[in-house]
């Protein structure tokens, strides 16, 4: 009786991208791709604002879709050539192998990354630089354990680096796009106005009631 139904995904991604001051273009871009049991999440922040910045971040996303099987470090090396004719960008890439319970991470530039395990948050560090401006001599790739109590947040520098995770960021049932939107909302205030394009992308396990 026909092909077997494909299993429900065990991980979800979502995000929000808010252009600075209501601009037509955001210099940020985020995307995710799934292939061969791997889920890869990317966030790119093109240098500056406007269309030229958007072209740089969009070029980064295009490479993710072309080669979703590459490790974070290998994808960033590929981007160094692909972004050479753009302004360049800060880029972070996280790749999740759910079956192995492993998360790989690599980044260049000022993309923030935090991994929650249970109630504990840990920063994932990128190396300084600009993708497309010069080739990185060495590109460290970090490895971390991943389980059903984990959550990954990537964010551009429009979000204050010292933002505090609220209740939404500890939820196991909220859609990741909702979590991202709440993080952006809670991090901005009249005392700390947003001064740049702001993007937050979230990777989370599917809640138990959505699994087969």
Residue ranges with predicted function:
Residues 1-212:
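Conserved subregion of the PPM/PP2C metallophosphatase catalytic domain
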């Amino acid at each position: 009786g026909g092909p077997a139904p494909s299993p429900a995904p065990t991980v979800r991604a979502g995000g929000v991208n808010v252009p600075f001051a209501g601009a037509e273009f955001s210099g940020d871009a985020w995307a995710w791709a799934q292939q061969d049991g791997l889920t890869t999440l990317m966030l790119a922040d093109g240098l500056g604002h406007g269309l030229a910045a958007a072209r740089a971040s969009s070029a980064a996303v295009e490479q993710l879709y072309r080669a979703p099987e590459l490790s974070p470090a290998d994808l960033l090396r590929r981007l160094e050539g692909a972004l050479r004719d753009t302004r360049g960008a800060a880029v972070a890439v996280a790749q999740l192998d759910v079956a192995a319970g492993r998360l790989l991470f690599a980044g260049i530039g000022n993309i923030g990354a935090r991994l929650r395990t249970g109630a504990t948050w840990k920063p994932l560090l990128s190396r300084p630089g600009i993708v497309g401006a010069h080739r990185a001599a060495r590109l460290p790739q970090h490895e971390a354990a991943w389980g059903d109590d984990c959550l990954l947040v990537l964010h551009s520098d429009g979000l204050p680096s010292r933002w505090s995770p609220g209740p939404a960021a500890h939820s196991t049932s909220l859609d990741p796009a909702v979590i991202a939107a709440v993080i952006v909302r809670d991090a901005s205030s009249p005392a700390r106005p947003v001064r740049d394009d702001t993007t937050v992308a979230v990777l989370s396990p599917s809640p138990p009631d959505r699994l087969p």
